[in-house]
């Protein structure tokens, strides 16, 4: 019996375009009249935000928008995380677009800027004045579980979800074992380390739809973006680009909400690309375990 696929060489249809450098990745895409965005991030892992003054940044010629949490129609969304399995179900968490009241982690987004050039956007970030009150924070998961531990989120407890895994008769297994080894094992978080940092361009089309051309593994984030802006879902369109690496790290929402907010505010196309350092700081990681 002759097979048609197994054992046959199949050409990789995009190989030549990639080796020749002809692929258009997210950051390669530009539009006329495009603005450039930057994100102001918290320099503290835990702090109260006492005041934010954006007046100097807004007064800088060439700056078209400076946004904080008060400018986001729906800044706090409840989101489902995880997958329903036989050992545990999805749990509900908070997706906060921009820090509000306090910051919960180093690098949490505090403000957004859109300007005529990348240099102007960076200068505008320097002019935003944020008054912080540093808080003690908590930096070890076992310490975070103790009664009275500093609450990272809005709840008094740092336990997001709890479930037990039971399989077989452990006591019988121990009784029959020749050797029992007990230890505590820690696995650190792992960065996905893709070559292409997070990037995208957003624009408004003639029908008033916000289009977001973004490096992502999940285009369904248009639903979240629509909720952030308080728009019907058919008013947001997410277009996935050629991906310069993902490995699961671009499954979570990254620049989409920021781009949509700035385009919605200015009416202009907006590009946002993270630096390598910003990508390492800001994007989701593979979870650590104990």
Sequence positions of predicted segments:
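Short acidic, glycine/serine/threonine-rich loops at helix termini
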Residues: 76-82, 124-127, 215, 223-225, ...
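Short Pro/Gly-enriched beta-strand edge/turn motifs at strand-loop
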Residues: 81-85, 175-190, 272-280
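Phosphate/diphosphate-binding loops
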Residues: 109, 115-116, 264-290
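Conserved beta-alpha junction segments in alpha/beta enzyme cores
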Residues: 170-229, 288-289
């Amino acid at each position: 019996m002759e097979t048609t696929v197994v054992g046959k060489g199949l050409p990789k249809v995009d190989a030549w375009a990639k080796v020749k450098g002809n692929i258009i990745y997210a950051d390669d895409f530009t539009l006329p009249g495009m603005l450039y965005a930057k994100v102001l991030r918290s320099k503290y892992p835990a702090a109260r935000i006492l005041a934010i003054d954006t007046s100097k940044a807004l007064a800088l010629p060439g700056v078209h928008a400076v946004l904080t949490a008060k400018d986001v129609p729906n800044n706090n969304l409840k989101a489902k995380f995880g997958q329903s399995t036989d050992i545990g179900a999805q749990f509900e968490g908070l997706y906060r677009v921009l820090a509000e009241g306090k910051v919960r982690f180093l690098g949490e987004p505090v403000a957004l800027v859109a300007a005529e050039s990348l240099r102007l956007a960076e200068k505008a970030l320097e002019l935003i004045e944020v008054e912080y009150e540093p808080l003690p924070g908590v930096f070890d998961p076992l310490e975070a579980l103790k009664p009275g531990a500093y609450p990272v989120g809005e709840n008094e407890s740092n336990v997001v979800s709890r479930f037990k895994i039971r399989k077989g008769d452990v006591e019988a297994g121990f009784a029959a074992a020749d050797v029992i080894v007990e230890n505590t094992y820690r696995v650190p978080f792992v960065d996905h380390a893709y070559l292409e940092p997070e990037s995208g361009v957003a624009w408004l089309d003639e029908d008033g739809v916000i289009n977001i051309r973004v490096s992502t593994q999940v285009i369904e984030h248009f639903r979240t973006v629509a909720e952030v802006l308080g728009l019907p879902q058919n008013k947001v369109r997410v277009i996935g680009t050629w991906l310069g690496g993902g490995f699961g790290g671009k499954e979570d929402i990254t620049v989409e909400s920021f781009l949509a907010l700035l385009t919605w505010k200015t009416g202009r196309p907006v590009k946002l690309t993270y630096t390598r350092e910003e990508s390492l700081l800001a994007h989701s990681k593979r979870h650590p375990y104990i």
